[in-house]
């Protein structure tokens, strides 16, 4: 399936990193003011926070393609495989050649009736007034949460329904709740979240007592523990957990 979410340019969202509310159309430019420029990171992190789902990859289109909306771009790519080559050489991306190939095959194989488009302006945004009296379109958090769970749930994670516990092993509050939202919207079965005994963990890790690594375990490891895939922790609170998968968050999880 292909899910397309249209977010009006005038939508205000909280920019990741504590920069306050900005129009989504301005978030990339805000990030580009950093040294070094971080426009893509600002935008992807802010969208991930807004929708409550992980964002694994991006394509930044050049001016020859950026005037196409998402539906037009997909139709353009499906018309001719050569157009995928044009996309590769006329965009910047964090996807490698193999991932771009898989994207091409995936887009080309999806039936037209399996492409779903949702415009947030229809029923997910509210007209509001910011403290400085600026008129703004703000998201309805409850509706966005329901939408994200519906659109972005991973069918395999949802089917496995393994119990997942989340531990915050840092002194920064709120990390476990943020991770729980991401995992739940992917269809994960989060049974609890709490602070670990350890409070200075650098790299996050994902642990399981099972010798057979499940799809859910591998997906969460790629999401949270790219820097620590064979790590372990001596922590009394974590070791008492009866969850099938334990996600232990370190300082690298922002």
Question: What are these language model-derived features?
Answer:
Residues 1-254:
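Non-catalytic, solvent-exposed segments at the cell envelope interface
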